[in-house]
């Protein structure tokens, strides 16, 4: 049961964050790599509207604030798809896309397929995804359930679950609280065998730059679908 709970938690919080293949997956899902990092160069891709006349990618040193340090024009290689290959080791840098149409220049965006962002999610981050994988990640599989009627489900909000001063947990209100043995033990004592986790992706309503200010939201205002919510991390300024 412990393994079932842990794997259910991982599936609920992390399943969307580390897929890197561009081919069709075994479950029929399609993935898209917006950013592919290497020490020699980083490849960027963006699916932009057909009315786009040009797309630029802006590189920043900071996840928030500061001026852009480089701008690169992207090339249209297929219908609605734009690419750019930026030379050099960009790990630790941040980026945004900016689309131009015949009528106007759009606001900068991290892109809907960003997997890591700076504080408050306005800029995407260049990271090495392989470095973020915990041991055994590639072999992880979701637990099998014979029938949905066998499920005893507990609904969990990351912050609410562990934020109480009496919780006895070290990482109160954080993702890491669910890795603490006491947290898993508590869930087991409830008699549940599945966890329904409320939104874990990056949402807009909590200011991640103010971690010491009490803030709360259920999370149904998504900002970056494929990025973990920064306010649940131990340091939202470190994308990896």
Indicate where each model-derived feature is located.
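Aromatic- and acidic-residue-enriched carbohydrate-binding clefts of CAZyme catalytic domains
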Residues: 167-177, 207-240
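The feature marks proteins involved in alpha-glucan
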Residues: 17-43, 73-155, 160-173
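Conserved, mostly hydrophobic/aromatic
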Residues: 46, 97, 156, 197, ...
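Bacterial Sec-dependent N-terminal signal peptides
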Residues: 1-21
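Carboxylate/His-rich catalytic cores and anion/metal-binding grooves
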Residues: 187-212
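Short proline/glycine-enriched turn/loop motifs at strand-loop junctions of beta-rich domains
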Residues: 47-54, 157
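A conserved hydrophobic secondary-structure block that centers on an alpha-helix together
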Residues: 159-195
């Amino acid at each position: 049961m412990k393994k079932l709970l842990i794997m259910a938690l991982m599936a609920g919080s992390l399943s969307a964050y580390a897929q890197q293949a561009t081919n069709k997956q075994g479950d029929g899902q399609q993935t898209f790599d917006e950013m592919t990092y290497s020490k020699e160069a980083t490849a960027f891709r963006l699916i932009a509207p057909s009315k786009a006349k040009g797309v630029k990618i802006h590189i920043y040193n900071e996840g928030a604030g500061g001026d852009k340090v480089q701008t690169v024009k992207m090339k249209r290689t297929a219908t609605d798809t734009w690419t750019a290959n930026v030379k050099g080791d960009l790990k630790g840098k941040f980026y945004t896309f900016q689309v131009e149409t015949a009528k106007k220049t759009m606001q900068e965006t991290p892109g809907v397929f960003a997997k890591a962002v700076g504080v408050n999610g306005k800029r995407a981050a260049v990271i090495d995804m392989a470095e973020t994988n915990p041991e055994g990640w590639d072999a992880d599989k979701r637990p099998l359930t014979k029938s949905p009627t066998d499920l005893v489900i507990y609904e969990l909000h990351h912050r609410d679950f562990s934020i109480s001063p009496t919780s006895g947990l070290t990482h109160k209100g954080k993702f890491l609280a669910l890795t603490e043995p006491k947290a898993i033990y508590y869930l087991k004592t409830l008699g549940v065998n599945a966890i329904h986790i409320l939104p874990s992706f990056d949402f807009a309503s909590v200011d991640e730059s103010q971690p010491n200010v009490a803030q709360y939201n259920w999370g149904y205002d998504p900002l970056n679908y494929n990025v973990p919510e920064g306010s649940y991390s131990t340091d939202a300024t470190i994308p990896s």
